[in-house]
Amino acid sequence: MLNHFNFKLKRDVTIIVPGEAFVSNKRVISTILGSCVAVVLCDESNNLIGMNHYVLVKSDLDISPDQRGRYGIYAIPMLINAMLENGASKSNLKAKLFGGTNFMAKGSVKVGLENSEFAVNTLNKYRIPILAKDFDQSKSRKIFAFPENFKVIVEYPDGTKVF
């Protein structure tokens, strides 16, 4: 996790890397995604956002507790719990999902697709509404999530979108 002042945004930003999650009511949260997925949760009533960044859905190996955030099967429940521990109400949670790029050649394992489908299915099981999904299978992206309005700015190599 890296905290810095972003001169373009004129804001304090916390950058998370694979395996990390962060919850805030003040700081913009950012990450860079390829095949990984970031789940961004919001409780607008409590002005709270959280973001995780996971690499794979699961592992067939034993995972040490400090590595669990790298896997969606752990990362999504951990993010939900972190939101609740910071004052969010489960009934207020809403989600936006990003990432899931497939860089591999045709016919290869589609890690990005598996990651994105897992996020959607898991949030549906938790009954958390998904307000936006950005799973373009061909583009990496950098995302910035804002706590005051749940706006997420996505920067691609060829442009920018707001979700």
Swiss-Prot record:
Q: What is its EC number?
A: 3.5.1.44
In the UniProt record, does the keyword Nuclease occur?
Answer: no
Q: Which Pfam families match?
A: CheD (PF03975)
Catalytic activity annotation: L-glutaminyl-[protein] + H2O = L-glutamyl-[protein] + NH4(+)
Q: Could you list this entry's UniProt keywords, alphabetically sorted.
A: Chemotaxis, Hydrolase
What the entry lists under InterPro entries is as follows: CheD-like_sf, Chemorcpt_Glu_NH3ase_CheD, Cytotoxic_necrot_fac-like_cat
Any GO BP annotation: chemotaxis
An example Gene Ontology molecular-function term: protein-glutamine glutaminase activity
Member of which family?
Belongs to the CheD family.
Q: List the NCBIfam families.
A: PRK13494.1
Q: What does this protein do?
A: Probably deamidates glutamine residues to glutamate on methyl-accepting chemotaxis receptors (MCPs), playing an important role in chemotaxis.
Protein name listed in UniProt: Probable chemoreceptor glutamine deamidase CheD
